[in-house]
Regions:
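Formylglycine-dependent sulfatase
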Residues: 1-3, 7-141
Length: 141
């Protein structure tokens, strides 16, 4: 499963943001260092990701905050150590399988919006089922 986070300063208050970059962050479960062609994969090509990489920044020293997905996502969007995030494990709950992240949790989405960005997420969320406080629309996404 992959999550793509898009942020844009298009259409925001020009007095608040000037020339801030657009951000595209791609998170893919089980994607290894050399699984895309711009980082050495030669058995198949990933031309669209390669083009994005050639026109922007590529970070190669990233690591997972946990061995399972929900705590890793929580760690990523809150900036908290996994011992401090509310979501500490993948739970076997119905629907999304997670306790919802509280709506008052300060996240990268809230920080970006506070600085004039528009944000969105596509793909797996895993931080709260629909109609809970952890749902993306209740997390400033």
């Amino acid at each position: 499963m992959a999550t793509v986070t898009l942020t844009s300063c298009a259409g925001v208050d020009d007095n608040k943001i000037e020339d801030n970059p657009n951000i595209i962050f791609i998170l893919a479960d089980d994607l290894g260092y050399a699984d895309i062609s711009c980082l050495g994969q030669n058995k198949f090509s990933t031309p669209n990701i390669d083009k994005l990489a050639s026109q922007g920044m590529v970070f190669t020293q990233h690591y997972s905050g946990s061995s399972v997905s929900a705590p890793s996502r929580s760690w990523l969007i809150t900036g908290q150590h996994t011992g401090h995030t509310v979501i500490r494990g993948n739970k076997g709950l119905p629907v999304e399988g997670q306790h919802p992240m509280p709506s008052d949790t300060y996240t990268i989405f809230k920080m970006l919006k506070d600085n004039g960005y528009k944000t969105s997420v596509f793909g797996k969320w895993g931080l709260g089922a629909p109609q809970t406080e952890g749902a993306p629309e209740n997390q400033s996404v």
